[in-house]
Amino acid sequence: MIISIVSGKGGVGKTTITANLGLALADIGKDVLIVDVDIEMPNLSLILGMKEVEGRAYATLHDVLRGEAELEDAIVGREMGKSQVLVLPASLALEKLKHVREDRLKEVFLAIPDFAEFVLVDSAPGLGKSALAAICYSNQIILVATPEIAAISDNLRTMEVARRVNAGIKGFVLNRYQRETAIVNAEEMETLFNASCLGVIFEDKRIGACTASGRPFILEYPSIEASLTLRKIAAMLAGMSSEEERESEKASALGRLLSLFRR
């Protein structure tokens, strides 16, 4: 199952949501691969605290697209909290942009389902080649939206393109929401996008601080509303019943409590 996290506009928290949603799925026992296909401005490795990406011996997505590495050589296991995820990072080095063949992204999308039950793709913003590949070759897409004029306008275009190519639109996440300043609420955005709101994540300085320091907020602050919202979305994507979701939440809470005593 490939689920691409998309947005018509940059800076809306798409990468942060992709990383933390991937960890939420891993936390309920799912095999997860998180992929960065933002070719020009990749940030996923930074959000996940992978400071060793550029100095490591293994490859990145850019090397695969340049024909210099096999896909399996670019996928790395990452211990995050009490779970493990697979990550296919993109390179942060400018020189790796040379000779990248984005047409090879189709081959990547056809191959990545073999590596995990759930593949979460951090798409590039907008409607460039890599963003269109994420929309066209995924089983489902989740839009990340913020309640701002520019973001809404760009996301309306993204949704229009997604519908034209018959993409499986799962819904949208309303991110960085503030009741006092938002020009629209979740219900109004459902009408605008003709799609379901999967969850609302309120503006929270702790999230920004975690993102800036490369620490997933779902691990640092597992009980804040944003973390609980992503866990509910993960349970929904996994097809868990309400009872299974409650049991998973209990197990996660117990695991977090036990980890405190091990410190």
Predicted regions and their residues:
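Short, conserved glycine- and acidic-residue-centered signature motifs
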Residues: T18, A57, R101, L105, ...
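C-terminal lobe/tail of nucleotide-utilizing enzymes
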Residues: R164-R263
